[in-house]
Curated annotation (Swiss-Prot):
Gene Ontology CC, one term: chromosome
Organism: Streptococcus pyogenes serotype M6 (strain ATCC BAA-946 / MGAS10394)
Protein family: Belongs to the type II topoisomerase GyrB family.
Reactions it catalyzes: ATP-dependent breakage, passage and rejoining of double-stranded DNA
UniProt-recorded name of the protein: DNA gyrase subunit B
């Protein structure tokens, strides 16, 4: 025992300064890249591009750049070109090195700190250039400034050679070229053109008049897009409403500046029942909203009510319209430019500056009041839409109260057809929404009763894209789902109260099954989106074929692009000697017994499930409206354009 204590004492004495590791320069970034770019997966890889593009956008925000070009090179490296002033090349006092070298080799170096470089910056932390350098096998920068072309190259963050002049020029700007390091990005170093193009288009909308393009030079993937919107966020609203019926043609656009904070709002009403409000702060999409949205919402509600009362559209003794009423069918984009944005929330995408509430409120109120006075016909349409929404809300409230009395939107009154699980651990619990009573019966028998619950639904549920709130709440199947999930509804919705953290849609592998799946996804997207954003929603992948030898099923074939190849391979595999394999086609879940359903579709050890995510809310909104909304023409166009890829289930 004494010997052990002596040994312990010796170990303690050895813990001295020599044991402390100091990470020099950009070594810390390479050691812990996730701290700087979020992850080393696909999202983090694309974040490298945004760090460099954001620097060019900063030049545009400051009024010095008008054209940005992004290239995915043939070798999958990235080049970003802008026509700004060019990164400074003179000696930086603190480091004694050229400023451009400092920007790419020293963390927190750049024109974004201290207010001397940029009035407003798109960057969250100003470490972008050096982080990209640290996480690239090679990076080079060309600065076009003062009639000269300055060039410097780096490898994994380290300087290869001093800054040099390699030519003359009559233009200004900066060109950055980098190759992501596969030692860091072990999952993939392949850039996704569509991911880059969507964000680049968004930046073009948010920066009126800016020209920004993306070009893919990779073999077999060559494509190019140019974005330029003189209408700015007004054009963005038109883009979002492209497939919708609008109640007035030209979006309302307002802009203003107060206390150094610039506010832009564009909005337009549609005939739909859904609200689409997107907000941005310094070009960063604030998915979680924030103080700019608060100010906008409060002003919108107050101004519409004031106008309605003053013009006798609403009587003095009538209740005011609520925020929910005046936002029904609204599509709006809010963009603020703030010299010192504060971001908070779970994903740091919520604007927290308290002063922005009153500034947005005041600037938007003044402009919106003026618009309503100058456009009385449009103003009346807006108010009347709000009044209709109010009537539907009151009817929905009555329906909700009746529903609570009859079957309850309360957890204590779970729907009768729900076969619940015994576990109370939401983290492991799974709710399967199953098409039809027959399959529901098999699923109930075959499941693991400890953590798997079954909710059968009959037929096609209501298309919520075309329905008012009172009709939605009157639908028994929809009510059952909300009650089973335990999350509440509407303003009371709380994803933290979800009783299951896997919500699995399990429908037949035919056209009807696909339709039911789409209806359920529409419902979840419109009224349970936090469940979707939390990653709780899955689609079961039941087999489409079973390969039998005699009476025994040897292999199941899952649906997918290569399903016919899988089937062909399986048939060849089991065509041995005299045995002749046969194919069983599963059109419905009810064609499988409980054991088969468990083995192929529900057993966590064997099953395949597709998780449903929302990477692009604006695009998702447009697609749901096109597929499920009132307008037939966009849906017909989509079917005609994509029919060649469809499989008919006859």
């Amino acid at each position: 025992m004494i010997e052990e204590n002596k040994h312990f004492e010796k170990k303690m004495q050895e813990y001295d300064a020599s044991q402390i590791q100091v990470l020099e320069g950009l070594e810390a970034v390479r050691m812990r890249p996730g701290m700087y770019i979020g992850s080393t997966a696909k999202e983090g890889l694309h974040h490298l591009v945004w760090e460099i593009v954001d620097n060019s956008i900063d030049e545009a925000l400051a009024g010095f750049a008008s054209h940005i070009k992004v290239f995915i090179e043939a070798d999958n490296s990235i080049t970003v070109v802008d026509d700004g002033r060019g990164i400074p090349v003179d000696i930086q006092a603190k480091t004694g090195r050229p400023a451009v070298e400092t920007v790419f080799t020293v963390l927190h170096a750049g024109g974004k700190f201290g207010g001397g470089g940029y009035k407003v910056s798109g960057g969250l932390h100003g470490v972008g250039s050096s982080v990209v350098n640290a996480l690239s096998t090679q990076l080079d920068v060309r600065v076009y400034k003062n009639g000269q072309i300055h060039y410097q190259e780096f490898k994994r963050g380290a300087v290869v050679a001093d800054l040099e002049i390699i030519g003359t020029t009559d233009v200004t700007g900066t060109t950055v070229h980098f190759t992501p390091d596969p030692e860091i990005f072990t999952e993939t170093t392949q850039f996704d053109y569509s991911v880059l193009a969507k964000r680049i288009q968004e930046l073009a909308f948010l920066n009126r008049g800016l020209k920004i393009s993306i070009t893919d030079k990779r073999s077999g993937m060559e494509q190019e897009e140019h974005f330029h919107y003189e209408g700015g966020i007004g054009s963005y609203v038109e883009f979002l409403n492209d497939k919708k019926d609008v109640i007035f043609e030209t979006p309302i656009y307002t802009d203003g500046e107060l206390e150094g904070i610039a506010v832009e709002v564009a909005m337009q009403y549609t005939t739909s029942y859904q609200e689409t409000v997107m907000s941005f702060a310094n070009n960063i999409h604030t998915h979680e909203g924030g103080t700019h949205e608060q100010g906008f919402r409060a002003a919108l509600t107050r101004v519409i009510n004031d106008y309605a009362k003053k013009n006798k559209i609403l009587k003095e003794n009538e209740d005011n319209l609520t925020g929910e009423d005046v936002r029904e069918g609204l599509t709006a984009v809010i963009s603020v430019k703030h010299p010192n944005p504060q971001f908070e929330g779970q994903t740091k995408t919520k604007l927290g500056n308290s002063e922005v509430v009153k500034i947005t409120n005041r600037l938007f109120s003044e402009a919106f009041q003026r618009f309503l006075l100058e456009n009385p016909q449009v103003a009346r349409k807006i108010v009347e839409k709000g009044i209709l929404a109010s009537k539907a809300r009151i009817a929905a409230k009555r329906a909700r109260e009746v529903t609570r009395k009859k079957s309850g939107l309360e957890i204590s009154n779970l729907p009768g057809k729900l076969a619940d699980c015994s576990s109370n651990d939401a983290n492991q619990n799974e709710l399967f929404i199953v098409e039809g009573d027959s399959a529901g019966g098999s699923a109930k028998s075959g499941r693991n009763r400890e953590f798997q619950a079954i909710l059968p639904i009959r037929g096609k549920i209501l298309n919520v894209e075309k329905a008012t709130m009172d009709k939605i709440l009157a639908n028994e199947e929809i009510r059952s789902l909300f009650t089973a999930m335990g999350t509440g509804f509407g303003a009371d919705f709380d994803v933290s109260k979800a009783r299951y953290q896997k919500l699995v849609i399990m429908t037949d592998a035919d056209v009807d099954g696909a339709h039911i799946r789409t209806l359920l996804l529409t419902l979840i997207y419109r009224f349970m989106r936090p469940v979707l954003e939390a990653g709780y929603v899955y689609i079961a992948q039941p087999p489409i074929y079973g390969v039998k030898v005699g009476s025994e099923i040897k292999e199941y074939i899952q649906p997918g692009i290569d399903q016919e190849d899988q089937l062909k391979t399986a048939l060849e595999k089991y065509s041995i000697g005299r045995s002749k394999p046969t194919v069983q086609r599963y059109k419905g879940l009810g064609e499988m017994d409980d054991h088969q359903l468990w083995e192929t579709t529900m057993d966590p050890e064997n099953r395949l499930m597709a998780r449903v995510t929302v990477d692009d809310a604006a695009e998702a909104d447009k697609v749901f409206d096109m597929l499920m909304g009132d307008r037939v023409e966009p849906r017909r166009d989509f079917i005609e354009e994509n029919a060649v890829y469809s499989t008919l289930d006859i």
